Amino acid sequence: MNERLANEKISKLLLSLAIPSILAQMVTLLYNLVDRIYIGRMEDGALAIAGIGLCSAIITIITAFTNLFGRGGAPLASISLGADENDQANKIISNCFSSLVLSSIVIMIVLYIFGEEILLLFGASANTLSYAKDYLNIYLLGTIFVQLSVGMNYFINCQGYAKFGMLTLVTVSYTHLTLPTILLV
């Protein structure tokens, strides 16, 4: 366990753990914004943006599973680490990792099979369905990586390594920001 968590003042710890997490979330927001800028500049940009909007509800559901296992498991692991029950903490982390992988696979399979029907249920029209399906299928390819990077990041943070956690998300976000620039421009 990180000794800082046991010895430093709470106010200093709070800032040192919160600021990197806030910055990581801001960078994540930035790459979502950049996606929309690139897509909005397409020939049918308005329809494509509407397609992304339809996928937002599905992505929120995927994020809920990520948070279930990441945000749900990290405090339990943190409590175990604080009680010097490292074996218990390792079991919690392993179970959450496995749950993230399994839920990713199930989500991907379900959405590849029923994605079109779900998008129609969420209000897709003939004009927006193809854009929504394309975006969703591309997003699904990275679902397992997104769930693992975000979900396991909570465990990095709960051990007191918020700067490292921020760097992992910033690295992923930077890659996501630069690839469209390289591939689309």
Give the label of every model feature segment:
Residues 22, 26, 30, 34, ...:
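Generic alpha-helical transmembrane segments of integral inner-membrane proteins
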Residues 1-18, 77-144, 177:
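Short alpha-helical transmembrane segments in multi-pass integral membrane proteins
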Residues 11-30, 58-65, 141, 167:
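Residue-level signal for short hydrophobic patches within transmembrane helices
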Residues 39-60, 127-131:
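Interfacial/gating helices of multi-pass transporter permease domains
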Residues 49-109, 146-165:
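Small-residue-rich hydrophobic transmembrane alpha-helices
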Residues 35, 73, 114-115, 152:
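Hydrophobic/aromatic residues in alpha-helical transmembrane segments
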Residues 175-181:
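Conserved small/polar residues in nucleotide/adenosyl-binding loops
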